[in-house]
Amino acid sequence: MSKARSQDEVGWKRNESLCEYSMHRSRRPIQEKSIQSRAEHNFTLTRAYAINGSMTPDSSNLHHSSQVAVGRDAEGSANTLNTPFSEACFSQLISDGARSYLDFDFPDETIPGTSQAKNTEPDHQASGLQNQMSCDSLRNNTIMLDWLDLDYDGNLRQYSTAQLYGLLGADAHNGSAKCTLSLLPERMVADKAEAKLLLNHKMYGLTALCKNADRGSRRQQAVWEKVEVLLSSKHQTCVSDLLRKVDSSGEHQSLDLTSLPIEKLVQRAFRELGGLNLFIKEQDVTRIQERFLDPEKLPVDVSDMSLLITSLAWGALLDPEKLQRCYFARMVAFLCLAEKTGSDNLPALILGSISTAASLSLHLETALRKSCVSNDQAVQTKRAMWILYCIDKSYALRWQTFSLVGDGSLPTTNPPDTALPSEVATTLSLEWLRIRSQYSKICSNILQLGVGAEGEPSENRSNRAVVLSAALEEWYGSVEISQMMLSLEHSDAVHMKLQTSYHYYEARFQLLSISLPDPRSSSPTGSQECREVLRRSIREVITGSNTITSEYLLQDCNHLFIQTLALSMLALDILLESDQGCGKENRALLSIVAGFFARVDIILPQSSIFEEVSNLIEILTYR
């Protein structure tokens, strides 16, 4: 028996009360007998979960870091890895064939015989795998939300969203306690993953056109290498990451919350169109703030602290009631903030929000009503589902990946358009949500066109692209958008115009990358029409960059991306020229782009995007 164990090199230990597992990685592929049947491991996202115990760790027992909350079925028996995150991951891995998660490689596992010392303490033996597959764990007095993802090399790796425990410090002086908050960037856990989602799919359309335009030349290769860097998800600018590096000196390691204009920050966050005022109430975060700053109150829970932190960062105000529904609202709030800042955790937050909504069956009216204690909460949850839908479609369109939220995942066919009696300033936000939902449906159709573009006849593909182009033009020039801009103040109207134009041009560029014919095609007329539309779109985006203020650049990373995308399309258009030259108009556009990114470099000196842009412009202009 010991011989068989040494052959498989797999140790399995289970504790029924804690659902603990221990696995030692095999140096050889797992034998065929370890592969489980597909039906046995085919998890479903729509399963309801009952969390055993509180998500907040017991502060009196901080040394027991191996204790985590695990999924349990209705009867109370512990399930293997049944959490929304893990089931979403494994259900995708088993879609094409049965494969046991025993086959995966765990790089953080200690292997006997290596230079690492083998720890034989019982606590370490029992926590080998659970620390890698926990949905909520405690590390160094820090509460972590962890999940698993599959790397490009086929290995499961662990990722963490943020450290939410241990952020508070109390400086006792003369009998009074002073609440301080450690500098957020220093407490955030950056995503260390090197593999990004489906980058090759993002590059496919433009790469093919570029290669056909200037096949094999050194100039083309140099240009496309720079374009790949600028457009890759790995090199996208994350505003929060850059601000983190600006000043990390020791004298700024803590922040006195009482010195912040908390009320002003919250009120400003709730004024933003289509923001968190759709599904969160402003007075809820005010109550959390008062409870946190009042020395007579009990310590604030970790979950409430995360709500306050998010509200100060962007106004992510969450429901303080201890309901499952508020966990979904919290994740959508983080998702909104991640979209604005360009966080590389965005795909993980999308997946987490979707799996949480599915586990709570929020797409079903009866289940949604059961999860909410009032009609107001039910309406806010429906809005949050639609916000998740819109963000998912925009992300899928940008990186040409598959969309995770379908129309059947929504509780209603259209976003709720009725303002609640307690709401005052959400009417315009509701209008903006309705406008963006219409755009998201167009994105879904563009994605379907892109998926079938390779095997579809060019004539059918062009006809479908024309129909989608007309729908996009109708949306951009709709009466709803015009009327909404007239009802806004000047600054808000400018901000909304930028947002709608960015959505429009990003979808336009995606349609052009699909419908642009091969330069060697026998249909020069159609090709010329697409080229004219491409040039006009590039010109409008680049010349409009002077309307983007420095404040806007720090508030939304999409300002940077759309200008980067326009520059990349301009590089493609220059390479498509038969004489491989750079005309007068193109030189002028390149100069405007250089000025825009020079301004970005001044605002965000830690960013390397200006250097990359300068190198690309030099290649296009002088080589």
Swiss-Prot record:
Keyword Heme among UniProt keywords: no
TM region(s), chain numbering: none
Protein name (Swiss-Prot/TrEMBL): AM-toxin biosynthesis protein 12-2
Lineage: Eukaryota, Fungi, Dikarya, Ascomycota, Pezizomycotina
Signal peptide location: none
Induction description: Expression is up-regulated more than 10 fold in toxin producing cultures.
Keyword annotations: Virulence
Pathway(s) it belongs to: Mycotoxin biosynthesis
Region (Disordered): 110-129
Annotated organism of origin: Alternaria alternata
Additional remark text: Gene clusters encoding host-selective toxins (HSTs) are localized on conditionally dispensable chromosomes (CDCs), also called supernumerary chromosomes, where they are present in multiple copies. The CDCs are not essential for saprophytic growth but controls host-selective pathogenicity.
Protein task: Part of the gene clusters that mediate the biosynthesis of AM-toxins, host-selective toxins (HSTs) causing Alternaria blotch on apple, a worldwide distributed disease. AM-toxins are cyclic depsipeptides containing the 3 residues 2-hydroxy-isovaleric acid (2-HIV), dehydroalanine, L-alanine which are common for all 3 AM-toxins I to III. The fourth precursor is L-alpha-amino-methoxyphenyl-valeric acid (L-Amv) for AM-toxin I, L-alpha-amino-phenyl-valeric acid (L-Apv) for AM-toxin II, and L-alpha-amino-hydroxyphenyl-valeric acid (L-Ahv) for AM-toxin III.
